[in-house]
């Protein structure tokens, strides 16, 4: 019986990527998305050669399209360093596309583990998921840093608009050979949006919310985050939280990391930009794998999102693939980028068939793994080292085929 394709009323923005993830991205589209959906895709290639050819304008255009259509689904991309500039003969060492997109969309990145019963956790006490919300604007990622050469005074100056009454702070008096300096910032508007997004996410999940800062050291900077979160909580969320039996609490980052390690999970953790970058990888590994993590950027308007894979472009596998060798690359996070993006499209469009499809595709991924069909990285978590043999895992395409079979079975079962 032929499957009647699901019509998706409104477009989605697709941001293609680099290396091995670009290879699996195409396979996911061809085997798990396009056979089942009638879909208008606004396509942007964020592969490094095309970013270079367009002077990185394509990255900005893709973010602007996301603002227009409200849903973007992004493949992993290369952030070039010196070696990549040489390898690709780039005009410039282009900025991280994720950083560019996040700064335009000014959102909060929420990451959450994909839990499979048969994948052991490095932190066995984590029996419930932990959703980490990373403020995706400003701080170190928008900072101006410099190398200081020689002796001299470093000053921080603020000149108010329409006034000559500048405020000047002496930061440090360099007396030796020099050193390094950094100036960074954030805005009240962005922190307020971060607070709203975090409060909303925790309320939707009916989980408590924790904000972590180091306000004992950065009394003004981190203190502002703490104050704004408290204001937003008191004004808009306190009564809702009390009714739902959940709570909001501020904690010092060091105390929060210790608490996270001994907790059972089941909460939303709001992190400043750098803390979120670091702690999301700590959580991913603790739950089992970076390849089992969802990542969604939620914008302040509440209706615009960008879903992505939380890992890199898997360069090592791509080198093997280029030589015609067999790879076993985990595509689950990339599949979940599609499902989370499409699920949001379904919610915006009130499209129940599409929402049901995304749930079945996610269940097909987890079902495949729990039935013993998985890629090498996951098999290695279960069967350590030399005990692992080729029969214990599937290659890149075999795994996507296994998910496709599982998905078709679930769709047919629902139809019957």
Curated annotation (Swiss-Prot):
- Bilayer-crossing residues are none
What InterPro entries does the database record attribute to this sequence?
IsoCit/isopropylmalate_DH_CS (IPR019818), Isocitrate_DH_NADP (IPR004790), IsoPropMal-DH-like_dom (IPR024084)
Keywords, A to Z? Cytoplasm, Glyoxylate bypass, Magnesium, Manganese, Metal-binding, NADP, Oxidoreductase, Tricarboxylic acid cycle
Which GO molecular function terms does the record list?
A: isocitrate dehydrogenase (NADP+) activity; magnesium ion binding; NAD binding
Q: Which domain of life is it from?
A: Eukaryota
Cofactor comment text = Binds 1 Mg(2+) or Mn(2+) ion per subunit.
Residues binding substrate are 79, 96-102, 111, 134
Q: Which coenzyme or cofactor does it need? A: Mg(2+); Mn(2+)
Q: Where in the cell is it found?
A: Cytoplasm
Q: Which biological process, per GO, is one annotated for this protein?
A: isocitrate metabolic process
Pfam family of this protein, just one? Iso_dh
GO cellular component terms given for this protein: mitochondrion
Q: Which residues are noted in the entry as NADP(+)-binding? A: 77-79, 84, 262, 312-317, 330
Sequence positions that bind Mn(2+): 254, 277
Q: Where is this site: Critical for catalysis?
A: 141, 214
Assembly and binders: Heterodimer.
The record's section on PANTHER family has: ISOCITRATE DEHYDROGENASE [NADP], MITOCHONDRIAL (PTHR11822:SF21), NADP-SPECIFIC ISOCITRATE DEHYDROGENASE (PTHR11822)
Q: Which family does it belong to?
A: Belongs to the isocitrate and isopropylmalate dehydrogenases family.
- According to UniProt, the name of this protein is Isocitrate dehydrogenase [NADP]
| Source organism of this protein record | Solanum tuberosum (Potato)
Q: What is the lineage of its organism?
A: Eukaryota, Viridiplantae, Streptophyta, Embryophyta, Tracheophyta
Which gene does this sequence derive from? ICDH-1
């Amino acid at each position: 019986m032929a499957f009647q394709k699901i019509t998706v009323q409104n477009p989605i923005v697709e941001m293609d990527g680099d290396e091995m993830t670009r290879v699996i991205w195409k396979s996911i589209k061809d085997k798990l998305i396009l056979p089942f959906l009638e879909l208008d895709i606004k396509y942007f290639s964020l592969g490094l050669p095309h970013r270079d050819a367009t002077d990185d304008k394509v990255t900005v255009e893709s973010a602007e399209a996301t603002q227009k259509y409200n849903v973007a689904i992004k493949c992993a991309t290369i952030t070039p360093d010196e070696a990549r500039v040489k390898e690709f003969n780039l005009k410039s060492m282009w900025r991280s596309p994720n950083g560019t997109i996040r700064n335009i969309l000014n959102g909060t990145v929420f990451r959450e583990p994909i839990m499979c019963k048969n994948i052991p956790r490095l932190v066995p006490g984590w029996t419930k998921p932990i959703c980490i919300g990373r403020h995706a604007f400003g701080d170190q990622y928008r900072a101006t840093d410099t190398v200081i050469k020689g002796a001299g005074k470093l000053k921080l100056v603020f000149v108010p608009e329409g006034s000559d009454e500048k405020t000047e702070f002496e930061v440090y008096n360099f007396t030796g050979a020099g050193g390094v300096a950094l100036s960074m910032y954030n805005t009240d508007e962005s922190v307020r949006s971060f607070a709203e997004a975090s409060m909303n996410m925790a309320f939707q999940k009916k989980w408590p919310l924790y904000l972590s800062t180091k306000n004992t050291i950065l009394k003004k900077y981190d203190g502002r985050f703490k104050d704004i979160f408290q204001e937003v909580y008191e004004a808009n969320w306190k009564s809702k939280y009390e009714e739902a039996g959940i709570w909001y609490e501020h904690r010092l980052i060091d105390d929060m990391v210790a608490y996270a390690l001994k907790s059972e999970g089941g909460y939303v953790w709001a992190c400043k930009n750098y803390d979120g970058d670091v702690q999301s990888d700590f959580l991913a590994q603790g739950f089992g794998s970076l390849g089992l993590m969802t990542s969604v950027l939620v914008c302040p308007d509440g209706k615009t999102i960008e879903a992505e894979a939380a890992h890199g472009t898997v360069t090592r596998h791509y080198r093997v693939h280029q030589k015609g060798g067999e790879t076993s690359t985990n595509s689950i996070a990339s599949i979940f980028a599609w499902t989370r993006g499409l699920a949001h499209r379904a919610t915006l469009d009130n499209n129940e068939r599409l929402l049901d499809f995304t749930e079945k595709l996610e269940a097909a991924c987890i079902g495949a793994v729990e039935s013993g069909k998985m890629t090498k990285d996951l098999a290695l978590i279960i069967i350590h080292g030399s005990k692992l043999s080729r029969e214990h895992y599937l290659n890149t395409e075999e795994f996507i085929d296994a998910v496709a079979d599982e998905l078709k079975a679930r769709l047919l079962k629902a139809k019957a």
